[in-house]
Amino acid sequence: MKKCLIFALIFSIPLFIFGQSFNVGEKSLIYQDSSRNRPVKIEIWYPTYEIDSTFERITDLPFILNPTIRDATFIQKDFPLVLLSHGTGGNRFSLAWLAIALAKNGYIIAAPDHWGNTFDNKIPEYFVRYWERPLDISFLITKILADKSISQYVNKDKIGIVGFSFGGYTSLALAGANLECSLLKMNAKTPNGKKEFNIPELGDLTKLIEQISCDNVQKTFKDKRIKAFVALSPALGLGFNSTEQTKTIDSPVLIFGAENDNIAPIKTNAEFYCKLIHSSNFVLLEGKVGHYVFLNEASENLKKEAKKYYIDDNTVNRDTIHKKVEKEINLFFQKSFNK
């Protein structure tokens, strides 16, 4: 197990060092994974030259987001493709702030709803069916690359992923991190497990974890089409205990951890993953930064309704952190795709 070198979030990165800035188009699509009888609803953000002074709100939740142009024209060139995987009980808009920022810098972003694990479609057993999520992402890549209306604008040799929380695990699983199902079930019974698997979005998951039939779960989800991997406060570290589970990871990995994360504590998750993955770097968000800092900024009304997710400690500026995290991720993808 390697020593994890911890880097603080670099607040000295200039905000505009990455070249041309685009306007952002947006569209919604839905695919059907017939092999799993599973709908995969997605949102796509992409660079465009179109200009539109209107902003159509695309979600009922009052997030503070930069404007996008619905169904704008794509630019005739190929861009890197980045997949986003939301956290448990979130949805495809959970990381919209990051999607829009990356699209402005020349990426095509695709974010699915992980069916059964979204805020508006909560199916309890799907909150622990961890294998469905990487399968969603691999399915989505296949569909996008086969869809000529999108694939003609995608550089298939430059595909990356960013995941948050449960989505952070998803990103690492696609890199080649192989969760041990029986270990997860065993650790779910420990004090740490009972704490980590009692989540605000649904409550106690430990009984659902006990019901998983490990023999029927796919062992590895590595997708070689993805060349760079980012995990924001990744969860499910309790399913790992050995570098044998990560030995096939041969692509660059960037892991972010929040020092005050009490949902997926860094010692058993972000920092622990870093120790297991030889090709990873770890960026620590220091101070009173909590787990949900990676979610969108919310309006004042939503902050009142969902304080846990949208109100940070008064020493934490979510907008500032978002800007710096996006720049770190942008720089990471540029280095990874152009090495």
Map each language-model feature to its residues.
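Domain-level recognition of soluble alpha/beta enzyme cores
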Residues: 20-83
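Catalytic histidine neighborhood in serine/cysteine hydrolases
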Residues: 276-306
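Acidic catalytic loop of the alpha/beta-hydrolase fold
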Residues: 236-238, 260-264, 291-292
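Alpha/beta-hydrolase active-site loop
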Residues: 126-157, 169, 173, 178, ...
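Short alpha-helix in the alpha/beta-hydrolase fold that links the catalytic acid
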Residues: 242-244, 251, 265-279
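Short substrate-entry loop that stabilizes the transition state in hydrolases
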Residues: 66-122, 262-265
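Short beta-strand/loop motif that positions the catalytic acidic residue
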Residues: 249, 255-257
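Catalytic active-site module of serine/aspartate enzymes centered on a nucleophile-bearing elbow/loop
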Residues: 299-339
